[in-house]
């Protein structure tokens, strides 16, 4: 069954990995604009983990957070950042340039060149600075910016391979120089990079369609089709509901996953990395999982299907989780729900108050 195979490939059933780096390397990229939620997306896919372990991997630079593949943040492993930027950096710049023009906040080449030199001065020597600290540094140098302009500037610096994520400060993300943060790696040709990206996606998101891969990768359809062709010997095809899906040869075609329940974070790969989400939830429930503006909510995953929403309530001494089901007649096993809530609380080193 499609969802059984997908649960295994996403490491949401019978997880194989213990370290955040192993997990992110397997997934290829994990969407991460909601920073805290993205850390949970990693943790919930590991055999056992904690927020501290994920934070340590980020601090060491084993995992990086940057704008890559599509115009949003993702977690990737350090070894993949340069070739992924080679594939996607130009497209992301184009998207942000278009957005900036619509907001009348274009950056001149003179401003960008001067700003990049200042970035190198501010961050040189393996420093990590928050966005606010960089804004303050620009101000001291006589370069006035605001929150929107500095964000646009930093995205461009990310996609040009000048900066990436640094070491968190007071739980806030920072920026660091990529050349100081990531040692030189073997370069990949564009063909090698395309094949590598397709392999990463289909091994960790299988079964998936070509349209799903186009959406996730940000590639043009022609180039995505070529990437799939480059690894065709590693892919099988199957029909699900009359649509052709690709399955990586390493997947378990006889997968049978029962008693699987997760509290998935907002923007989780299980939902957001596919163009067609009706394979895991009814269309009439889509608006409860994500809205027309592209905002995705925390959802409950039960036996391969998205069945409800959840939210935390940390006002009390113990962290509690409130749940609401799309279909109120569905009876979730209380032991599985308690186990999921307890792990979420344990991951965040907080006492569990179970759920209401």
Q: Where do the PLM segments sit?
A:
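Short, amphipathic alpha-helical interaction segments positioned at domain boundaries
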Residues: 84-100, 179-200, 204, 260-266, ...
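Glycine-rich, small/acidic residue-mixed loop/short-helix segments
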Residues: 283, 290-296, 300-356
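Non-catalytic regulatory appendages
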Residues: 230, 234-285
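Phosphate-backbone binding and catalysis cores of DNA-processing enzymes
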Residues: 1-129, 136-146, 320
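Positively charged, polyanion-binding regions of nucleic-acid-associated proteins
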Residues: 110-127, 190-207, 228
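A short acidic, leucine-rich amphipathic alpha-helix
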Residues: 57, 130-139, 157, 210-214, ...
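Loop-centered beta-sheet repeat module
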Residues: 147-225
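A short, conserved structural fragment
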Residues: 59-68, 72-73, 158-168, 232-240, ...
């Amino acid at each position: 069954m499609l969802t059984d195979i997908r649960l295994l490939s996403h490491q949401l059933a019978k997880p194989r990995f213990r370290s955040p780096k192993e997990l992110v390397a397997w997934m290829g990229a994990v969407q991460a604009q909601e920073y805290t939620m993205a850390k949970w997306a990693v943790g919930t896919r590991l055999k056992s983990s904690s927020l501290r372990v994920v934070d340590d991997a980020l601090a060491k630079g084993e995992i990086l957070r940057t704008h890559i593949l599509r115009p949003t943040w993702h977690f990737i492993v350090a070894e993949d950042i340069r070739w992924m930027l080679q594939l996607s950096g130009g497209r992301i710049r184009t998207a942000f340039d278009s957005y900036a023009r619509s907001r009348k906040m274009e950056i001149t080449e003179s401003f960008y060149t001067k700003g990049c030199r200042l970035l190198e001065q501010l961050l040189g020597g393996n420093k990590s600075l928050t966005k606010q600290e960089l804004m303050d540094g620009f101000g001291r140098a006589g370069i006035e910016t605001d929150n929107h302009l500095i964000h646009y500037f930093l995205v461009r610096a990310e996609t040009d391979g000048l900066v990436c994520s640094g070491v968190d400060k007071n739980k806030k993300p920072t920026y660091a120089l990529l050349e100081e943060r990531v040692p030189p790696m073997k370069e990949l040709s564009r063909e090698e990079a395309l094949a590598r990206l397709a392999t990463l996606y289909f091994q960790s998101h299988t079964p998936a369609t070509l349209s799903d891969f186009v959406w996730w990768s940000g590639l043009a359809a022609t180039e995505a089709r070529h990437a799939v062709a480059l690894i065709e010997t590693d892919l099988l095809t199957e029909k699900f509901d009359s649509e052709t899906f690709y399955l990586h040869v390493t997947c378990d075609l006889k997968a049978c996953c029962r008693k699987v329940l997760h509290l998935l974070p907002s923007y989780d790969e299980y939902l957001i990395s596919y163009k067609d989400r009706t394979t895991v939830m009814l269309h009439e429930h889509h608006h409860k999982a994500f809205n027309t503006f592209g905002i995705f909510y925390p959802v409950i995953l039960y036996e391969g299907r998205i069945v409800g929403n959840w939210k935390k309530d940390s006002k009390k001494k113990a962290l509690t989780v409130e749940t609401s089901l799309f279909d109120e007649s569905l009876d979730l096993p209380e032991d599985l729900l308690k186990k999921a809530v307890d792990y979420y609380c344990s991951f965040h080193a907080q006492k569990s108050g179970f759920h209401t």
